[in-house]
Amino acid sequence: MLKLHGFSVSNYYNMVKLALLEKG
């Protein structure tokens, strides 16, 4: 459960990072 939660958070973090990069 903790592993899955961690993966979910990591995936969300990556999405936010991508959005910021695209935003410039």
From Swiss-Prot:
A GO CC term attached to the entry: cytoplasm
Enzyme class of the recorded protein, top EC level: transferase
Subcellular location: Cytoplasm
Record bears the keyword Transferase: yes
Subunit composition and interactions: Monomer and homodimer.
Role, per record: Conjugation of reduced glutathione to a wide number of exogenous and endogenous hydrophobic electrophiles.
Descriptive protein name: Glutathione S-transferase
Organism: Pseudomonas sp. (strain CF600)
